[in-house]
Amino acid sequence: MLRYLTAGESHGPALVATMEGIPAHVQVGAVEISEELRRRRLGAGRGARMSFEADELELLAGFRHGETLGDPLAIRIGNSEWEKWRTVMAPGPVAPEDLAGHARAAALTRPRPGHADLAGMQKYDFDEARPILERASARETAARVALGAIAKAFLKQSLGIEVLSHVVSLGPVSAPNGPRPDPSDLTRIDADPVRCADSVTSKRMVAEIEACRKEGDTLGGVVEVLAYGLPAGLGSHSQGDRRLDARLAGALMGIQAIKGVEFGDGFDLTRRRGSQAHDWMEPTEGGIHRVSDRAGGTEGGMSTGQILRVRAAMKPIATVPRALPTVDVTTGEAANAHHQRSDVCAVPAAGVVAEAMAALVLAECALEKFGGDSVTETRRNAQAYLDRLAARGLAVAP
């Protein structure tokens, strides 16, 4: 079983992540994980923090000589701004006079609409929002991206599975339905300022971001995650919480600001008749072939062996520079919300986080299906399964 946890606050000393269940001999280390963290900082529309924020990665446990040991893994991502926050975010008691001179120590009593501020204050009995927003911040996703880098390495080395993402819409601007990006396109997508596969649409998206920035507003959008090389049979039909699509949807909805998820043609399927909504099958010399991929690579809660295709919708960032109306919880009076430093648009980065979450779910499902204490064992078990499908005439044909 694959298990992981993250800990840490946005302006605390560090984020920490632990994970248990990754087999031995996955070739992955600081270079590969740091590259994924770099990708998370990509994209037009990011705030000032991205220009100086450094993810100070340290591998604490479970690695040796560039590979995993099969032990629990532990990772630390240091906060390069910690010295500025050492007093305000100190874990131990701080005298009131020591806080008096710090602007950052001002009580945040005007909760921001769209954030966890007010609900968190109500739930955890805080008088201000700082204790809530620090953990609710999307900064936490850096830890999940680091773990996702390990899951990606395991998937590729054991099963040949590759996961990528691209931005398909940003605000009112949508990319046309064109050729689906594959892993060979990832470098080109990452080089694009909004991680859009269509260069013409990308320019329109950048213009929309700049217009939003000038108007003191924010933008949301939709990212698509694609997974290539999946075998049929990951997940299960037997219980709702074991269905692959349910697990992926839950993982993606767990990303800050994600408000919707769809697989394949998703909501468009509701506008078609059944005869035009499903993926017909036909026999070929290579096995059973589906003539379309409307389902997005899952049927009955299991992978079909086709390309997994899932989209996640990100709402506009809730920290709006021109400040939304709220209530000051100290006075009970109407007020404008606090403005914390934020992005205009973080949709390109959300795609990288979504890749990580999808990889973690797929790695867990792969280990449930094939097991293995080492990458070699997982690979051997998976190949035996594929050979058995072929012998029975049930292989998946591209």
Swiss-Prot record:
Residues reported to bind FMN: R135, A136, S137, Q256, A257, G300, K315, P316, I317, A318, T319, R341
InterPro entries to which the protein is assigned, alphabetical: Chorismate_synth, Chorismate_synth_AroC_sf, Chorismate_synthase_CS
Catalytic activity, EC: 4.2.3.5
This protein's UniProt keywords: Amino-acid biosynthesis, Aromatic amino acid biosynthesis, FAD, Flavoprotein, FMN, Lyase, NADP
Coiled-coil boundaries: none
Keyword Iron: no
Cofactor remark from the record: Reduced FMN (FMNH(2)).
Residues binding NADP(+): R40, R46
Cofactor field: FMNH2
Molecular function terms, GO-annotated: chorismate synthase activity; FMN binding
Protein origin, superkingdom: Bacteria
Record-level GO BP terms: amino acid biosynthetic process; aromatic amino acid family biosynthetic process; chorismate biosynthetic process
Region annotation (Disordered) ranges: 279-300
Pathway: Metabolic intermediate biosynthesis; chorismate biosynthesis; chorismate from D-erythrose 4-phosphate and phosphoenolpyruvate: step 7/7
Catalytic activity: 5-O-(1-carboxyvinyl)-3-phosphoshikimate = chorismate + phosphate
Presence of keyword Flavoprotein: yes
Gene Ontology annotations for the cellular component aspect, listed alphabetically: cytosol
Quaternary organization: Homotetramer.
Family named by the database record: Belongs to the chorismate synthase family.
Described function: This reaction introduces a second double bond into the aromatic ring system.
Name of the protein: Chorismate synthase
Natural source organism: Cutibacterium acnes (strain DSM 16379 / KPA171202) (Propionibacterium acnes)
Lineage start: Bacteria, Bacillati, Actinomycetota, Actinomycetes, Propionibacteriales
Gene name of the record: aroC
